[in-house]
């Protein structure tokens, strides 16, 4: 049943009538029962593990596409290849850290920033910097470098970020 508020204004005239819809939320929430927390957590962890396997399979396709697009840009300097490369890298980096590949996220972020900045300035991106980023991604994928990797992996990522910082003036390292 809906409740209403009739407000009296000075002089006996009614002001506005407010209608309050019924609150049915409480009836939708169970008062007891449901899965025990440890089972719900175990199921959620299993789902994440399944998604991780899907991500790794998808990553293989993405890496092949990155390689193809870099080769296409190398041969033709086709700006469409760069736009597609940006899209693929942007998608890869978005989920990489969630599934244990933060280095892919960092390298992808660096390359995406570089490509965006060059486009905004109307400048042609340097092939060498694109290739170095793509090669780093290939190594991370091929060697299955998860987590923050070893010191060489970290130094490589920092080196790529510094190169992009020099080219763009944008801060990547914090």
Residue ranges and their predicted role:
Residues 66-77, 96, 115-122, 144:
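Secondary-structure edge/capping motif, primarily at the C-terminal ends of alpha-helices
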Residues 37-83:
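Long, amphipathic alpha-helical coiled-coil segments characteristic
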Residues 79-117:
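Extended, amphipathic alpha-helices with heptad-repeat/coiled-coil or helix-bundle character
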Residues 79, 83-87, 127-131, 151-155:
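Short, charged, amphipathic alpha-helical segments
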Residues 2-32, 130, 134-173:
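Structural secondary-structure packing elements that flank or coincide with functional cores
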Residues 51, 80, 115-131:
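Histidine phosphotransfer helical core of two-component systems
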Residues 57-60, 64, 90, 109, ...:
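Generic structural signal for well-ordered, non-transmembrane alpha-helical segments
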């Amino acid at each position: 049943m809906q409740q209403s508020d009739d407000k009296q204004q000075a002089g006996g005239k009614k002001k506005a009538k407010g209608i309050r819809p019924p609150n049915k939320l409480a009836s939708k929430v169970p008062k007891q029962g449901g899965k025990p927390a440890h089972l719900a957590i175990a199921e959620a962890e299993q789902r994440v593990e399944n998604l991780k396997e899907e991500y790794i399979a998808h990553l293989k396709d993405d890496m092949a596409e990155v390689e193809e697009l870099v080769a296409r840009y190398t041969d033709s300097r086709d700006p469409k290849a760069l736009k597609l490369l940006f899209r693929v890298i942007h998608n890869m980096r978005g989920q990489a850290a969630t599934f244990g590949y933060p280095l892919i996220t960092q390298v992808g972020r660096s390359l995406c920033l570089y490509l965006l900045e060059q486009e905004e300035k109307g400048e042609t991106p340097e092939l060498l910097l694109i290739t170095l980023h793509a090669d780093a991604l290939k190594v991370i994928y091929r060697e299955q470098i998860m987590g923050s990797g070893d010191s060489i992996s970290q130094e490589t990522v920092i080196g790529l970020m510094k190169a992009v910082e020099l080219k763009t003036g944008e801060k990547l390292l914090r």
